[in-house]
């Protein structure tokens, strides 16, 4: 039953309205600007990379799925097929888990010193940097994010995260503590075993690093499932891991769908831990499958509807630019996006006008072109879902300041969209849209905005923009979220833990805190006869 619900959630698709959103309100703001952009997205650039790996990576070898099935991965710029990828299912997960279990129980990986493991991870980081452009091109082709973002931010961050955890590998240790009698008492920090990891499509490389890095540093083996929308970059990364010297079976990569491969990992009796990043609805199902199988440990990084609070003392120009980045980065496809922009009434009108102007200037187009800020959404399902939410916003009475429709006639491009006069109970203010839609809400004082910001089922992150230290500290303490960015946003260094309160997840990724996700603590008590001291 849970598997069927996974299928329902993953296959759900909203149909977009055949009418322009502008026609609903008789609006045509920025029409010439968007007309020029629309013409620019029609001609696509040939990506500077070849697809070499489309099979599953199991036991150190690239292999076809047992069923022989494949599925297409699509170019979001035009909906055309990039490649046919092997479609893993439960049988393939069984093979991958068996390979991971053998590597953990019998292979050289658990017998290596921690220093030897760290050297492999450092070599891997070197290979990432060597292949930076190739990895970035695959990421952009499969996902649609700007190539400059992939090449200058995300692939370097991928290498940085693995260097961070390579440094941790030989610093993981237990403790000794005094007992109440003649005993030697110590703890051992041991790898948890076979870790199942399910990563999303919005940041395939970064989410892979946040999960693989600590798991490998702690000495575990892994079965990783990629998102069906973006399987390609992980397969190249898997090849580079083996070039770095990773033993066969330590990391196994299965491309496939949530209802089959994902559910098989979460419910597998020989998987000791599962980590998932994705929607809250699917996260609940992962938790259910884990509890009904072998009660495996679970880490969940789920949805968000993060408040971005602009206080009355803010420099409006700076606040507009930061709020724009907080929402529109990565086509708005960020779990922690600042998607509820709360602005103090004193500066609200000025902020709205400048936010509208900034959205109209946003450079949207083929992500392989230089200077592009926004590419297409990842697929037709996400594209149609976003357009439906925009329609909801218009019909609910929010004021459409900019955007509101698709851009161009092919591909999954959406105009940068800004709503003002948004009320807390509108769907565009409560639901995770996961797209380039900024909602701007007005507030009067701190007590009010704290209550409204916390009135959400989510609690992943928040942004605060103020020049007052007391205000910053009050909001920092009062907001029920896992991360608060003060006068900045999306600072995601490898050492900074990331995770949510409430329905935004369980546990933390990155930093020292993530190591606990992949370790067991064993207490060892040894009786001593005639000890010299206690």
Swiss-Prot record:
GO terms for molecular function: aldehyde dehydrogenase (NAD+) activity. Signal peptide: none annotated. Its EC number is 1.2.1.3. PROSITE patterns: ALDEHYDE_DEHYDR_CYS, ALDEHYDE_DEHYDR_GLU. It comes from the Eukaryota. The active site is at residues 301, 335. Residues 1-34 form a transit peptide. CDD domains: ALDH_F2BC. The keyword NAD applies. Keywords: Mitochondrion, NAD, Oxidoreductase, Transit peptide. One of its GO terms (cellular component) is nucleus. It is found in: Mitochondrion matrix. NAD(+) binds at residues 278-283. It catalyses: an aldehyde + NAD(+) + H2O = a carboxylate + NADH + 2 H(+). Homotetramer. Possesses activity on acetaldehyde and glycolaldehyde in vitro. This is Aldehyde dehydrogenase family 2 member B7, mitochondrial.
